[in-house]
Regions:
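Active-site-proximal cap/lid insertion segments
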Residues: 1-174
Length: 174
């Protein structure tokens, strides 16, 4: 709009949890990071970064780990679970990129300083152990490029909720 008429825009992205969906090109940006580091190292790095930024007190420790250690997984399990986390990261990346485009458009139009932005999401990392889709007759539903991996699992969910316990479907800190 070129005038100062108020407007309302509701922009809804699919929440970054099951069913996880992202473009393969975006997934590729994150796969190696998660495959190489695994959840143990990622969790430690996120905790340190939050403490360094003052988001959490450096004295806050980690919640008890309730999952297998990354090094206990087979190579095939590491490949599979790293891919699932990369799909999640790609989905968040896409949302972040496009929200950035919207903000840039508001800046260019001179409307950003007179705009109220609410960013809302659901309540924490999703750990539901949904399985791969399969067995159906509708090929578009059973297409990995469309369905991605329905969930990234409990270990990545607990990593995402660092330093808190559990995940969103529990009445814990996650």
């Amino acid at each position: 709009q070129k005038d100062n008429t108020p407007f309302f825009l509701y922009l809804a992205y699919n929440a970054p949890h099951w069913p996880l969906q992202a473009k393969e090109a975006d997934i590729e940006k994150y796969y190696e990071l998660y495959r190489t580091k695994g959840w143990d190292q990622i969790r430690k790095e996120r905790h340190k970064r939050m403490a360094d930024l003052g988001i959490i007190d450096s004295e806050i420790g980690f919640a008890e780990w309730e999952n297998r250690q990354w090094e206990e997984l087979s190579e095939a399990e590491k490949d599979h679970t790293a891919y699932r986390m990369a799909v999640y990261a790609a989905q968040v990346h896409c949302m972040d990129y496009n929200i950035g485009k919207l903000i840039e458009s508001l800046k260019k139009s001179g409307k950003l300083d007179n705009t109220l932005i609410f960013f809302m999401s659901d309540n924490g990392a999703c750990a539901e152990p949904h399985n791969e889709l399969g067995g159906g007759k509708q090929k578009d539903i059973n297409n990995p490029a469309v369905s991605g991996h329905p969930s990234y699992g409990k270990a990545w969910a607990q990593t995402s909720n660092t330093p808190f316990r559990k995940y969103k479907q529990r009445a814990y800190e996650g």
